[in-house]
Amino acid sequence: MTTTEVAQQLVELCRHGKFDETHQTLFADDAKSTEADDSMGPRVVQGLDALKAKAVAFQAGVEEFHGVTISDPIVAGNSFAITWSVDATFKGRGRMTMDEVCVYQVKDGKVIAEQFFY
């Protein structure tokens, strides 16, 4: 898959709530994920199993999702970016909206790195 195809598929899956499927189909086994800070867990994790565990931990911290908005991707070379807005009630933290920019790197048709800015 091209970077554009990976980007479009990631956005489509996420818009339909198929977050687990993104890891299984679009990410490399040694993919790296970098958060802006460590307020919700480790700042950096590497490896598909670690990325999946991070996603499970995030979802476990949510009492209720009220809405998710994901932009169309902007693609340049082997990278793409999307904006992501999550309106959710978090356990022990209340309801909040999180806005972030997500940047992904693609190699050989798989996401090898993701980084979040918020």
Predicted regions and their residues:
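Hydrophobic/aromatic beta-strand elements that line small-molecule binding cavities or substrate pockets
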Residues: 68-74, 85-86, 99-104
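Short, cysteine-centered beta-strand-loop-beta hairpins and adjacent loop/turn segments enriched
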Residues: 88-97
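Short beta-strand edge/turn micro-motifs at domain boundaries
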Residues: 99-118
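Short acidic-aromatic low-complexity motifs
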Residues: 1-30
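Short beta-strand segments enriched in hydrophobic/aromatic residues
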Residues: 27, 86-88, 102, 118
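A solvent-exposed, acidic/Ser-Thr-rich amphipathic alpha-helical stretch
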Residues: 24-71
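Residue-level signal for well-ordered, solvent-exposed loop/turn and beta-edge residues enriched
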Residues: 32, 94, 110-112
